Curated annotation (Swiss-Prot):
Protein's cellular compartments: Cytoplasm
InterPro entries in alphabetical order: DUF896
A Pfam family that the UniProt record links to this protein: DUF896
Keywords: Cytoplasm
Cytoplasm among keywords: yes
Family: Belongs to the UPF0291 family.
Coarse class of the protein's main subcellular location: cytoplasm
One GO CC term, this protein: cytoplasm
The name this protein goes by in its record: UPF0291 protein CLK_1994
Length: 62
């Protein structure tokens, strides 16, 4: 699912849960969407961290 649509659906279900409550199916969908979102974010962070190179700092004497 497109990230924008994923976030929109998560937000919709959150607002609905506060206003009128969710059905059991919607609660399950909400959990799955939140897990998918978290997995995407974790994957993005992992890719960014793998691309980071450590730059050695020169020894400094004070």
């Amino acid at each position: 699912m497109d990230m924008k649509k994923l976030i929109e659906r998560i937000n919709f279900l959150y607002k609905k849960s506060k206003e009128e409550g969710l059905t059991e199916e919607e609660k399950i969908e909400q959990q799955k969407l939140r897990r998918e979102y978290i997995d995407i974010i974790k994957g993005n962070v992992k890719v960014q961290l793998e691309g980071v190179e450590k730059i050695p700092t020169p020894n400094r004497r004070n």
